[in-house]
Structures are given as structure tokens and as C-alpha cells.
Amino acid sequence: MARRPARCYRYCKNKPYPKSRYNRAVPDAKIRIYDLGRKKATVDEFPLCIHLVSNELEQLSSEALEAARICANKYITKVSGRDSFHLRVRVHPFHVLRINKMLSCAGADRLQQGMRGAWGKPHGLAARVSIGQIIMSARTKDSNKDVVIEGLRRARYKFPGQQKIIISKKWGFTPLNRDEYIAKKTNGEVIDDGAYVKFLSRKGNLEANLQQFPNYQYSA
């Protein structure tokens, strides 16, 4: 039987139905890669962060997430190179979609009249997103802003409903604003930790803090 159109599962009507010991034989999600581009780039290399934000309460199928990921990655890679950005899909398809299969193909001499609204068997996976939730994020250099915005704009057409593209005030994927990050970096209160930063703790062993944050300006 062919895959049912995703418009049948667009809205969040029921409770979340994740995979569990009671819900078995669930097919794998189509999307398997959630981080793309130059993942090992330090925080200082990619200061600009751009988000694709959902404007509706809906369900996004794993096929749509995979299509959007491929679309954004292909465009940005072709225009500016694969090492010019770091793209991350921020939602995961944990909700199991169900289908009650009934014969309606050419081989059936009549349409099968089954129970309406029956429970059904696992059919696919979808991510449940709310209004204002981030679907995809990309960090890059300031000079590459227009290319990343265009890549996310093209990926937006793979999803139902409305989405908006937002340029974040934060420094990369960190929770710090740009001026706040520069001030803390100058003062030695943060150090690079992959795509994020590690903060100086005000508690704990003083020697360990001194070793980890040697540039911090301790006041007497």
C-alpha cells in the first residue's frame, strides 16, 4: 500500500504516541543526520546564528525534515562551500503515526468498508512542533548571511503551514548575546567547548578553576 499523504497527519489532534514496549514494530525515521557542515568549527569562527521558526502548532513528518535538510545543505554547499556553515535540525520525529489499512486498489472488486476511526498500525514518524519553536538552526560567518537565509528559505517550502526566518542576537549556538560573549571572552570567564562555551563556576575547587580558566582576572 502506498504512503498516505502527510496532510492526513498535519495537525496535533491527539496525545504524543512515542515508540515504547507497548508500541512496537515502528519503522525507522527517514532523517538520520541532524548535524551538517563544519561541525567541529569553534565558537569564534561562526558568530552569526539564523533560525527557521515554526509559526503553527502542527506535525512535521520525518520525510519532510529529511527533504528540508537536503535542500538547505545542497544550496549552501553549492554557493559557499561545505566548510562555511554548521546546520542543525532542532526537532526529532518521536511521534508514531498510525494507519488502518483497507483494500481500495484495482484488484479489489468492491471498496472495503471497515471501522471508521480505528486504531491502526504504526505507519511513520513525525515531529510535533509548537508556535515559536525552532525547527532548524545554522551558524556561519557574517559575510555568509544572505546565502544561509536563502538556503533556509528554500527548505521552508518542504514544510506545511507557515515558518519564519529569524536572525538571532546570540553568538552562534551559545546562550550569550554578542556583546556579552565578547565581554566574557575578554575577561576570561568562558572557554571554547565545541560549538558551545564552558562557563567559569563560582563554586568548587579553586585550583581546578585556575587551571581551566587561566585568563580570568581574579580580583583581590
Curated annotation (Swiss-Prot):
PROSITE patterns: RIBOSOMAL_L10E. It is found in: Cytoplasm. GO terms for cellular component: cell surface; cytosolic large ribosomal subunit. Keywords: Cytoplasm, Ribonucleoprotein, Ribosomal protein. GO terms for molecular function: structural constituent of ribosome. Component of the ribosome, a large ribonucleoprotein complex responsible for the synthesis of proteins in the cell. The small ribosomal subunit (SSU) binds messenger RNAs (mRNAs) and translates the encoded message by selecting cognate aminoacyl-transfer RNA (tRNA) molecules. The large subunit (LSU) contains the ribosomal catalytic site termed the peptidyl transferase center (PTC), which catalyzes the formation of peptide bonds, thereby polymerizing the amino acids delivered by tRNAs into a polypeptide chain. Component of the large ribosomal subunit. Mature ribosomes consist of a small (40S) and a large (60S) subunit. The 40S subunit contains about 32 different proteins and 1 molecule of RNA (18S). The 60S subunit contains 45 different proteins and 3 molecules of RNA (25S, 5.8S and 5S). This is Large ribosomal subunit protein uL16. It comes from Candida albicans (strain SC5314 / ATCC MYA-2876).
